[in-house]
Structures are given as structure tokens and as C-alpha cells.
């Protein structure tokens, strides 16, 4: 995120020179409309195939959303308020940042979860644990020349699921569309496929995750 900061700041400066800018920051700040739907969490599950779909709201920069594949639950914590993570969780998302609960991840060369199911875990797959990083928690001071960050553990492999191009306004978000393997802290495995970063109305900050667990 840091490497894009000056590109983003320059682009915002250009936008401010335009005449009437009502609504121009909608895609930048990703403010959900008042009519945003409420159907979040594990919206589909299939016990026979051990698969399902998770739909979460990650529009806020101040919030982590925690997902437990074992319990099929989601929970949130406010970073600014210092709220702690729930007792049970497997991975979490903050905007497009992803972290694990003592786990590690691997990006596959597959295109679908069906290919993961048939191909399995590739021989020699190297899983990457979380590393110390920074995530943006407030964009309000961007025009003043700085952003507010929080230092935390983030998984660099899982966080590659979305490429964010801030060289244009509005930013361009491109999912990798690659299934990822998540090794949980207990040694079990899951396959995750991040399908998109928007809802049906094309509002950014809504993530659909297809999964298989246990793999």
C-alpha cells in the first residue's frame, strides 16, 4: 500500500482541481449505500462437498472481519477502539489485507476449486506464515499528505488475492482468481477462492469467498 501512496495523493490533487466533484470520491472511500444488503457470513454450505460461500463487508478501514471455518462463523473487531480478536478464528480480512491465526498460505496455479479438489496439495508446496506489516486504518488525512496506519501481522501470500492499481481514479481492483491453500494452526487445510471485491451494485468492499474445508 505504501508504494502507491504518492500516486494516490497526486491523483487526488488532480481531482480537487475539477469543478463540481459531488460523488467523485465514492469509489475511493467505498462508502456503502444506505440500501446495502445484510446477508453476510456463511451464506451457502454443503456438508457433502465440504464447501460453501462466505460473503463479508470489508468497507471499513477500521475493522477486521474474522472467519472461523470450523464453526462457520464471522466476527468483527474495531482496530481504533482496540478491540481484540475473537477466541476462535482461522483467517481474517481488513479491506484486501488478509491475516491468519497462526497459519500459513500457498498460492496455487489452479483456476478453480474443482481443480484443487482433484489435484490436491502440490508436491513441494511452500507455505508462507504471516509477517509484520502495516495496514491503513484511516484515509481522512490523505489530502493533508499522510495516512494513519496500524502495525499488525498480515499474510503476504493471501493478500495477493487482489491487485490494487491506484495510478488511475477511481482505483482499479483486479482479483488474482487463483485458489489459495490455507494451512490452519492445527495442521488441517482449506482452499480459498476470493471471487470478487464488490457487491451486485458494483460497490467496492464486499468480498465473496468460495471455500473447501477441510481439504
What are these regions (language model features)?
Residues 22-215:
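Surface-exposed, beta-sheet-biased, low-hydrophobicity segments with strongly acidic/polar composition
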Residues 1-4:
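Positively charged n-region of N-terminal signal peptides that target proteins for export
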Residues 16-20:
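C-terminal motif of bacterial Sec signal peptides marking the signal peptidase cleavage site
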Residues 8-9:
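Intrinsically disordered, low-complexity segments enriched in serine, threonine, and glycine
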Amino acid at each position: 500500500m505504501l508504494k502507491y501512496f504518492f500516486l494516490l495523493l497526486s491523483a487526488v490533487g488532480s481531482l480537487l482541481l475539477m469543478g463540481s466533484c459531488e460523488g467523485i470520491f465514492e469509489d475511493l472511500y467505498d462508502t456503502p449505500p444506505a440500501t446495502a444488503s445484510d446477508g453476510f457470513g456463511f451464506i451457502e454450505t454443503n456438508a457433502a462437498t465440504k464447501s460453501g460461500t462466505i460473503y463479508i463487508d470489508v468497507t471499513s478501514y477500521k475493522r477486521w472481519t474474522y472467519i472461523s471455518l470450523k464453526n462457520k462463523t464471522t466476527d468483527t473487531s474495531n482496530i481504533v477502539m482496540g478491540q481484540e480478536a475473537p477466541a476462535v478464528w482461522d483467517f481474517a480480512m481488513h479491506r484486501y489485507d488478509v491475516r491468519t491465526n497462526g497459519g500459513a498460505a500457498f498460492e496455487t496455479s489452479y483456476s478453480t476449486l474443482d481443480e484443487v479438489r482433484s489435484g490436491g496439495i502440490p508436491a513441494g508446496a511452500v507455505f508462507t506464515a504471516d509477517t509484520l506489516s502495516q495496514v491503513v486504518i484511516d484515509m481522512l488525512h490523505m489530502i493533508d499528505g499522510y495516512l494513519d496506519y496500524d502495525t499488525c501481522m498480515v499474510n503476504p501470500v493471501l493478500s495477493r488475492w487482489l491487485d490494487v492499481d491506484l495510478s488511475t481514479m477511481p482505483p482499479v481492483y483486479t482479483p488474482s482468481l487463483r485458489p489459495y491453500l490455507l494451512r490452519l494452526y492445527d495442521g488441517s487445510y482449506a482452499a480459498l477462492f476470493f471471487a470478487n471485491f464488490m457487491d451486485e451494485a458494483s460497490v467496492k468492499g464486499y468480498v465473496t469467498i468460495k471455500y473447501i474445508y477441510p481439504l
